[in-house]
Amino acid sequence: MNVEPIWQPVLLEEENTVTSHREPGEEFLFYRSVAAGLIDAVQDNCSRGAFENMEGVGKLSDNPVTNLRYHFVVTAAMLTRFCMEGGMPLEEAFGLSDEYIRRMDCCNNMSEIVYVHDQMAMDFVCRMRQLRKNIASSKQVAEAIDYIYVH
C-alpha cells in the first residue's frame, strides 16, 4: 500500500502508541437489547453510565466533548440499523436517528450529550417493545419472543 508522505508521521506515531480497545461484546449486547425491546436492560446500561465510559473505546478526537459527539453518532447509526433489522420501519428509524443527532448537536458539554444519548436509547427501545407487542398475538407468544431474545 502506497501511503502519501503527509500521513506517514501520523501512522508512525500511532504505531508507537499502544491503544487498548475493549471487546465489542457489551456494545453489541446493548444494540441487541434495544432492538429486542428489553427496556430494563437498556435502563440498566444507561444508569451504569456505559456510554460515557471512554475506557477502551477509540479516540476519535483529542477534545473529550467532540470525541463523545462522534461516539454518539456511531451509536445512533448502529441503533438505527439494529432496529430496522428488528422490524422498525426505515423512515421511522432514520427519522429518530436524525432528530437525536440534531439534538446532540445543540449540546454544550458531555453531561448534556449523555442525557440525549439516554433519551435516544429509551425512545428506540420503547418503540421496539411496542412493535414487538403488536406482533405478538398472545401472552404466550410474547413470552416466547422475550425468551428467545434474552437467550
What are these regions (language model features)?
Residues 1-151:
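Inter-domain helical "communication" segments and dimerization helices
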